Amino acid sequence: MGQKVHPRGFRLGLSADWQAKWFNEKNYKEWLLEDEEIRKIIKNKYYHAGISEIYIERPDAERVNITVKTARPGIIIGRKGAEITSLREELEKRFNRRMVINIEEIKTPELDAQLVAESIASRIEKRASYKVAMKRAIMNAMRKGAQGIKVMVAGRLGGAEIARREWYLRGRLPLQKIKAIIDYGTAVAWTKYGTIGVKVWIYKGDADI
């Protein structure tokens, strides 16, 4: 049976970066759980902001640097920065640490695998055809310059009695090539027939390593 490796974990330190940039042997468990809670709070509060990734750095025990990659920075920043100030104060009060929040705009969300997966899942939840949603995502990604894209959905597709999976591939997707820049994202669509999983791989070219 073939063994599969996570596309991001396979390339960490080369064409992919760590989402948590810190190490502390003494407080490792506490900080790891904090990181997950911080990500959950931000993702849930700004679900419609198109958040792809949240990077967390800890220069010392009292400060946390958070970088949010989003397709709609205005939703998180708010008018005159009111929303981001409110978020920072909420996190500082909850975790009793100084929070520094940076926002990075995603210029081409069509090439962000996580946002593409969430977009497909959202369309499926709204009872759109999963085939149309998949093909539209592929077409948009290729139009924006992707060298390859694969989209897979699994579950009771179209309300079928038996769960199955379907996938579409356009272009190239060299998963075993370490210097290949491959973005990977997953999402879940909640339907009345159960959950439908969505996975997206986008090949953007090769890194200079």
Swiss-Prot record:
Alphabetical list of Pfam families matching this protein: KH_2, Ribosomal_S3_C
List each coiled-coil range. Answer: none
Q: Which InterPro entries match?
A: KH_dom, KH_dom-like_a/b, KH_dom_type_2, KH_sf_prok-type, Ribosomal_S3_C_sf, Ribosomal_uS3_bac-typ, Ribosomal_uS3_C, Ribosomal_uS3_CS
Any Gene Ontology biological process: translation
Q: Which GO molecular-function terms appear in the entry? A: mRNA binding; rRNA binding; structural constituent of ribosome
Superkingdom of the source species: Bacteria
Q: Which residues form the KH type-2 domain?
A: 38-107
Report one GO cellular component. cytosolic small ribosomal subunit
Keywords per UniProt: Ribonucleoprotein, Ribosomal protein, RNA-binding, rRNA-binding
Instruction: State the family named in the UniProt similarity comment for this chain.
Output: Belongs to the universal ribosomal protein uS3 family.
Assembly and oligomerization: Part of the 30S ribosomal subunit. Forms a tight complex with proteins S10 and S14.
Role summary: Binds the lower part of the 30S subunit head. Binds mRNA in the 70S ribosome, positioning it for translation.
The protein, known as? Small ribosomal subunit protein uS3
